[in-house]
C-alpha cells in the first residue's frame, strides 16, 4: 500500500502470507529497497525448529550469489569489470557478499533497531521505536489516485489472471510451486494446490484485477504475481474495510529486474481505486512497525518422517522408538458429538465465531457467506468439525487448513503434509480436549505435522499437547492505521 508519489524502485513488498515464513526467502537482496521482497516471506510454518540463524544466513547468501547472475550479467555489470584481474573481481564479489550478509532482513526487534528504514520512513506506518497510544489512520484517504498502471521493465506486461480458467490457474500453481517460499536452508517449499489457491484467492467480494500477474510479452510466460482479497477487520474498537495482501512471487531468474517493487506498487494502486486505504499483512521479517508478533509451534504427528527429512531431530538421550511413543495419539477422538461441519451448521458456526472473537483486539468480521467460504469442509483444503450435544445444539468447533510442502532433494520423501490451526471456538468442550481431538483427526487424515501460532488462547494448550516451539516469528502489520501494539494472545486473525 505504497504512497502514490514514491518511485517504483523503492517500494518494498507487503507480507504474504504475504506468504511469508521465514517462508524462507529465496529472493535477491535489494539494499535500496529495504528487502522489499523479503517481506513476503517467513511464515514460520516451514522451518525446522532450533537451527542457528547465523549459519542459515551465510548459507543462503552463498546460494543466492551462485544463482544470481543468470539473466542480467551483460546488462547490469559494468563493462570495465572484464578488464579487471580475476583476483580483484573475486575480492569485489566477496565484499559484496559480506555486505549483503550484514544487510539481510532483520528477524528480531534488536536487529531492526540497528537498521535505517529510509523507505518505510516515508510511508504511513509508525516508526519502529514509536510508542503509539492513539487509534486511527496515519494519513487521510486519497482523492487523486493514479489511473494508469505502473511501468514494468521492458519486455514485461500486466495481466489480471482469470483463475476460473484451469490453464491460467495451473500457470499460477507452477509459478508458486517453483519459485515461492522456501525455508532458509532450501529444504522445504510451500506447495499450494490449485484448489487451495481458489479457496484463498476467491472469497466473497474478490476482484479479478486484484489477481495481478506479470507476463513476458514475447512468450506470455507468467513470471510474477501478487494478490489482494477484501476483508473487514476489527481493530480494537474500530471496524474497517481493508485488504489482505498475499502471494507475492517473482520468478527466480527475474529478481534482479526489480519486478517485485512494481508489483507491490501496482496492487496498492488497484486497491486505492476501490476506495480502500488500509491493509493487513504478515511477515517473518521485522519492519516498521509490528502491531503484534506471534510464534509458530509444531506438533509431530509422524515423527519418523519428520526426522528423516530433517524437519526435526532426535532429542538428546531419545531413540526413535521412544520418540514415536512420546508423540503417539489415540486412534479416535474422545469428544462425544464431534462430526464434520455440514451446510446446516453455517448460521451457528457464524454466531459462535462472532461471539468468540470479541475478546481479541485484531480479528476478521465475517458474514454468513464468508463463514461458508472459509469453514465449509473441502477435501485437502479446509477441515471443520463441530461438537453437537445431546439436545442437537452445536456448542464448539475446530478447524485446520491443509498446506503441504515440497521436500527438496530427498531420495524417498517428496512431500510434507502439514495441517495449520485455523479458528477453534469452545463454549462447552474444554479447548485442550478440542485441540487434542484436532491432532487425532489430522493424524487419521495422514498429516505429518500440525502447526499452530501462539495467538488467541493457543498458549493454553501448546506445551500440554507436546507442540515444540518453532525458530521464527510472524509479525502482523497494518498499513495506514495507527494503534497500540498487542500481545500474541490478543491477535485473533489467521491468514493463509
From Swiss-Prot:
What keywords is this UniProt entry annotated with?
Acyltransferase, Cytoplasm, Membrane, Phosphoprotein, Transferase
A Pfam family matched by this chain, by name?
Answer: NMT_C
Q: EC class of this enzyme?
A: transferase
Q: Which reaction does it catalyse?
A: N-terminal glycyl-[protein] + tetradecanoyl-CoA = N-tetradecanoylglycyl-[protein] + CoA + H(+); N-terminal glycyl-L-lysyl-[protein] + tetradecanoyl-CoA = N-terminal glycyl-(N(6)-tetradecanoyl)-L-lysyl-[protein] + CoA + H(+)
Q: Which residues carry this modification: Phosphoserine?
A: 31, 47, 83
What subcellular locations does the record give? Cytoplasm; Cytoplasm, Cytosol; Membrane
Which annotated residues bind tetradecanoyl-CoA? 118-120, 247-250, 256, 258-260
SUPFAM superfamilies membership:
Acyl-CoA N-acyltransferases (Nat)
Record InterPro entries? Acyl_CoA_acyltransferase (IPR016181), NMT (IPR000903), NMT_C (IPR022677), NMT_CS (IPR022678), NMT_N (IPR022676)
Quote the EC number.
2.3.1.97
List the biased-composition ranges (Basic residues). Answer: 55-66
Molecular function GO labels: glycylpeptide N-tetradecanoyltransferase activity; myristoyltransferase activity; peptidyl-lysine N6-myristoyltransferase activity
Membrane association type:
Peripheral membrane protein
Entry GO CC: cytoplasm; cytosol; plasma membrane
Annotated segments matching region Disordered: 1-81
BP GO annotations? in utero embryonic development; ketone metabolic process; N-terminal peptidyl-glycine N-myristoylation; protein localization to membrane
Q: What is its main location?
A: cytoplasm
Q: Summarize the protein's role.
A: Adds a myristoyl group to the N-terminal glycine residue of certain cellular and viral proteins. Also able to mediate N-terminal lysine myristoylation of proteins: catalyzes myristoylation of ARF6 on both 'Gly-2' and 'Lys-3'. Lysine myristoylation is required to maintain ARF6 on membranes during the GTPase cycle.
**Similarity section:** Belongs to the NMT family.
Q: What is this protein called?
A: Glycylpeptide N-tetradecanoyltransferase 1
Q: Which organism is it from?
A: Rattus norvegicus
Lineage at the top is: Eukaryota, Metazoa, Chordata, Craniata, Vertebrata
Amino acid at each position: 500500500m505504497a504512497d502514490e508519489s514514491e518511485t517504483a524502485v523503492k517500494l518494498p513488498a507487503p507480507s504474504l502470507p504475504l506468504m511469508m515464513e521465514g517462508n524462507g526467502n529465496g529472493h535477491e537482496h535489494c539494499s535500496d529497497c529495504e528487502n522489499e521482497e523479503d517481506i513476503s516471506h517467513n511464515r514460520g510454518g516451514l522451518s525446522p525448529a532450533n537451527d542457528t540463524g547465523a549459519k542459515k544466513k551465510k548459507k543462503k547468501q552463498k546460494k543466492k550469489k551462485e544463482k544470481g547472475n543468470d539473466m542480467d550479467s551483460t546488462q547490469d555489470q559494468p563493462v570495465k569489470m572484464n578488464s579487471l584481474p580475476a583476483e580483484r573481481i573475486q575480492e569485489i564479489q566477496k565484499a559484496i557478499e559480506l555486505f549483503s550478509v550484514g544487510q539481510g532482513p532483520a528477524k528480531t526487534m534488536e536487529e531492526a533497531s540497528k537498521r535505517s528504514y529510509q523507505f518505510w520512513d516515508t510511508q504511513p506506518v509508525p516508526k519502529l521505536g514509536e510508542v503509539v497510544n492513539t487509534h486511527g489512520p496515519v494519513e487521510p484517504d486519497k482523492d487523486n489516485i493514479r489511473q494508469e498502471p505502473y511501468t514494468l521493465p521492458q519486455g514485461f506486461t500486466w495481466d489480471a489472471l482469470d483463475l476460473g480458467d484451469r490453464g491460467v490457474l495451473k500457470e499460477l500453481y507452477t509459478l508458486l510451486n517453483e519459485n515461492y517460499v522456501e525455508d532458509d536452508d532450501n529444504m522445504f517449499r510451500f506447495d499450494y494446490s490449485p484448489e487451495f489457491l481458489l479457496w484463498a484467492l476467491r472469497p466473497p467480494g474478490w476482484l479479478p484485477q486484484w489477481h495481478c500477474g506479470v507476463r513476458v510479452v514475447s512468450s506470455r510466460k507468467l513470471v510474477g504475481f501478487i494478490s489482494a482479497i477484501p476483508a473487514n477487520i476489527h481493530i480494537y474498537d474500530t471496524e474497517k474495510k481493508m485488504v489482505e495482501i498475499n502471494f507475492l512471487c517473482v520468478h527466480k531468474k527475474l529478481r534482479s529486474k526489480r519486478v517485485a517493487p512494481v508489483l507491490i506498487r501496482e496492487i496498492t494502486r488497484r486497491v486505492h481505486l476501490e476506495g480502500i486505504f488500509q491493509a493487513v499483512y504478515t511477515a517473518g521479517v521485522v519492519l516498521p512497525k509490528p502491531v503484534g508478533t506471534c510464534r509458530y509451534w509444531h506438533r509431530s504427528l509422524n515423527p519418523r518422517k519428520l526426522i528423516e527429512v530433517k524437519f526435526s531431530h532426535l532429542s538428546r538421550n531419545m531413540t526413535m522408538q521412544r520418540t514415536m511413543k512420546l508423540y503417539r495419539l489415540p486412534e479416535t477422538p474422545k469428544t462425544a458429538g464431534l462430526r464434520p461441519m455440514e451446510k446446516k451448521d453455517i448460521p451457528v458456526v457464524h454466531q459462535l465465531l462472532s461471539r468468540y472473537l470479541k475478546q481479541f483486539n485484531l480479528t476478521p468480521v465475517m458474514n454468513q457467506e464468508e463463514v461458508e467460504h472459509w469453514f465449509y469442509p473441502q477435501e485437502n483444503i479446509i477441515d471443520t468439525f463441530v461438537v453437537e450435544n445431546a439436545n442437537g445444539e452445536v456448542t464448539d468447533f475446530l478447524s485446520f487448513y491443509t498446506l503441504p510442502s515440497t521436500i527438496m532433494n530427498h531420495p524417498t520423501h517428496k512431500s510434507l503434509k502439514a495441517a495449520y490451526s485455523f479458528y477453534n471456538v469452545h463454549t462447552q468442550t474444554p479447548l485442550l480436549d478440542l485441540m487434542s481431538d484436532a491432532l487425532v483427526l489430522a493424524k487419521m487424515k495422514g498429516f505429518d505435522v500440525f502447526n499452530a501460532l501462539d495467538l488467541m488462547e493457543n498458549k493454553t494448550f501448546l506445551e500440554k499437547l507436546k507442540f515444540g516451539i518453532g525458530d521464527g516469528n510472524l509479525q502482523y502489520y497494518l498499513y495506514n492505521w495507527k494503534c497500540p501494539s498487542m500481545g500474541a494472545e490478543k491477535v485473533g486473525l489467521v491468514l493463509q
